[in-house]
Amino acid sequence: MSVISMKQLLEAGVHFGWQTRRWNPKMKKYIFTERNGIYLIDIQKTVKKVEEAYNFVRELAANGGKILFVGTKRQAQESVKEEAERCGMFYVNQRRIGGTLTNFATLQKRIKRLREIEKMEEDGVFDVLPKKEVIGLKKEKERLEKFIGGIKDMKELPDALFVIDPRKERIAVAEARKLNIPIIGIVDTNNDPCEGGYVIPANDDAIRAVKLLTSKIADAVLEAKQGEEAAVAAE
């Protein structure tokens, strides 16, 4: 049984690519046809590529691997957060701070600062500080939570990146490639398929399409975890 059906892909609008004048020729093999000035993606290939990515993620998660979901465009922000949280993985869904992967020590300092402020609030320190200082600390906490809240529990580099629109997230992709971290990318017809290790040719601008594909990656993680739990129970 397939991980995903062509019917699901069609209903979510996964097959709609970009205007023909804004395409990347490297995506030619994933294009089915052109209609009214828009390229339509060959979703038979999308089905196959989703299965490949699903199997890779399931195997990775079964071996304790961690995945970082990345999607900062408006259409992806909600799905990235919801699905990463659903499967217990990390995410970045706001404007990325350069060096998140390549300068991991700096990221850890930011996480440490967020933890410090959270502890101050929990311990009642805010109650004895001047109001102006408390306001400043709360603003700092909100900003840190917004940008690194999804990775504050990430104690080491992820084992793979799942990226919506590698073209937009080119900094994250470049950092991952530099560190030899595998990439799974939802790649539209205006993208470079070489930028994603596991390419999923699909519409990366439709909220329903992004949600569907992101949920499948989360499902792969959950299937691996369920298998792990079943194995432990059997022992």
Swiss-Prot record:
The keyword Metal-binding does not apply. GO terms for biological process: translation. Keywords: Ribonucleoprotein, Ribosomal protein. Disulfide bonds: none annotated. InterPro entries: Ribosomal_uS2 (IPR001865), Ribosomal_uS2_bac/mit/plastid (IPR005706), Ribosomal_uS2_CS (IPR018130), Ribosomal_uS2_flav_dom_sf (IPR023591). GO terms for molecular function: structural constituent of ribosome. One of its GO terms (cellular component) is cytosolic small ribosomal subunit. Belongs to the universal ribosomal protein uS2 family. NCBIfam families: rpsB_bact (TIGR01011). This is Small ribosomal subunit protein uS2. It comes from Geobacillus stearothermophilus. The gene is rpsB.
